[in-house]
Amino acid sequence: MSSNHIEPADESTPDDLYTSDYEVGQDNLQGLGLDIHNPVFLISSVTIALFVLVTLLMPEQAAEHFSALRFYLTKELDWFFMYSMNGFLIFCVALALSPLGRIRIGGQTAVAEYHLLSWVSMLFAAGIGIGIMFYGVLEPMNHAMTPPLGLTDLDAQASRDLAMAATIYHWAFHPWAVYVVVGLSLSFFCYNKGLPLLIRSALYPLFGERIWGWPGHIVDILEIFATLFGLATSLGYGAE
């Protein structure tokens, strides 16, 4: 198989690119006008279809189990979520202040396709558009009435302060740090290193050619689950 890569947007030398024996689409299944990845599409689509089917056939039991799972995750892994978000933010600040922060996505001569205002508008619309419309008012009110962290003995002013602090934590710098890490991982390894625009490409420095096998398949399958159910939540808020 020939080496495969996506040409970057600037005059990067071949030494700057990752070359691979993998060819995009070599594992795909074609027919009936479709071009789907095997096994990522098959496993993810069948799993999602079964998940939706079980939810439709047993809505009450599904709601009970999902609620129990959500309660367990938020109660037992709250420390992990908090430290992870802080870690993402610290990482982004350190990255911006380091020499790596001067790397231009697409190469040194790359030019942005859209103006800054257009980029900012797309970031807000695609990133937190529906969520902030729904939760921008609901979340601080909900936290004020039922304070987080189990602090139920607060006075009114303390409850309001904590409610705003929790809301700012959820909608200010911390979530954007997560978006930045994912976005930079995709764009850097695609447009600067010539790899396919896949989450698994960001793991190439760690796993090398193994990302084209099951380690990479698992990463992409989990990515599909996270994207689908995340979008379903946002669309559900919009429908309400």
Whereabouts are the PLM-identified features?
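N-terminal alpha-helical transmembrane segments of multi-pass membrane transport
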Residues: 2-158
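Helix-loop-helix module between adjacent transmembrane segments
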Residues: 32-35, 39-42, 46-56, 89-92, ...
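Membrane-interface alpha-helices at helix entry/exit sites of multi-pass transporters
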Residues: 79, 154-162, 211-221
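Flexible, active-site-adjacent loop/turn segments at secondary-structure boundaries
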Residues: 101-103, 135, 139, 162, ...
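Membrane-interface helix-loop-helix junctions at boundaries between adjacent transmembrane segments
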Residues: 141-173, 187, 207
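Catalytic cores of enzyme domains
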Residues: 240
